[in-house]
Amino acid sequence: MNKVLINDTTLRDGEQAAGVVFTLEEKVAIAKFLDTIGVPELEVGIPAMGEEEMRAICAISNLGLKANLLAWNRAVISDIKASVACGMERVHIAIPVSGIQIAAKFHGQWRVSLQRLKDCISFAVDQGLWVAVGGEDSSRADENFLLDVALYAQEWGASRFRFCDTVGVLDPFTTYGKVKLLVSALTIPVEVHTHNDFGMATANALAGIKAGASSVNTTVIGLGERAGNAALEEVVMAIKRIYGVDMGIDTPRLLELSQLVAAASGANVPPWKAIVGENTFAHESGIHAHGVLQNPDTYEPFAPEEVGWERRLVVGKHSGRHSVSNLLEQHGIFLNPEETQSVLDAVRQQSIKKKRSLTTEELLNLVKEQRYSHAAR
């Protein structure tokens, strides 16, 4: 696999999620954390939004981070000027490329949109800026027109082109083909930006990488517009564990990072969320728990410590004797097989009644109720 660069946009697209507002202090904390764990590039915001946004971007720019920082801009000269005022050395310029987007934003005048793009790239380059261009709604654009825009952007001085599945309508197979077309035609790197409207943001990001894209947009916990974006933790771990490529990210801190962003955004991370959900390494099923106790590889794709978790055995409706005895032995309680079965029966009954698994305290109380205190050592 080609070398892949993570360009995380939690501070831009992530904050565009409905109902999410980061304070300046939260933005600084998130930027520092992303930089600390080794994320090489951050899209830090939209200077044209106004003074408050500019203050946050300036604060991040003044941190002296190792990561490269970009500001997001429309194809408007005043946007570029605002980015320069924030101390940005890199800018991303977005331009609509689909018929539906050009009709809505430029009244169908695609020549006007291209001239705007050319003028903005020229202005940015004259300012000494590194320029990336993004084709907004690339996934629904005419492929020939999209390719023309990308080639023009390259000719006019862009150093990277972003393929955007803006409304998340692609599958991995189509993504591969569309990105491959750009990669084959351009000499500048291609970046993929995917959305999760059909639950395929991470899969589409990986497909774009397989097609030759050398940069990928992510957000922590998949935070973003509508159904969100490709999740940083999912992309990083998939590349590391499925493709065998270590991107230099400090993965044991991914859980801590996700908790920081979840708290700042007010987002509730589902327990079943890949990589960072609290049930990712929790086992209740008797067959699974027994297997994991014998060899964790039986039911885990990688060690929980690799992303900051610890393995957790849960007792409930689906538990078996091995889970119960293992948890009790951790608390110095050793039961014979008949006693263990009796406790297990009680666990299952209580779990059904409560419609959830039992806490450790509830399990220990069941043992007391069964009057097996003699088993404690």
Swiss-Prot record:
It is an enzyme of class 2 (transferase). It catalyses: acetyl-CoA + 2-oxoglutarate + H2O = (2R)-homocitrate + CoA + H(+). The keyword Transferase applies. One of its GO terms (molecular function) is homocitrate synthase activity. The keyword Transmembrane helix does not apply. Keywords: Nitrogen fixation, Transferase. GO terms for biological process: biosynthetic process; carboxylic acid metabolic process; nitrogen fixation. Its EC number is 2.3.3.14. SUPFAM superfamilies: Aldolase (SSF51569). Residues 4-255 form the Pyruvate carboxyltransferase domain. Belongs to the alpha-IPM synthase/homocitrate synthase family. This protein is a Fe-Mo-cofactor biosynthetic component. PANTHER family: HOMOCITRATE SYNTHASE, ISOPROPYLMALATE_HOMOCITRATE_CITRAMALATE SYNTHASE FAMILY PROTEIN. This is Homocitrate synthase 1. It comes from Nostoc sp. (strain PCC 7120 / SAG 25.82 / UTEX 2576).
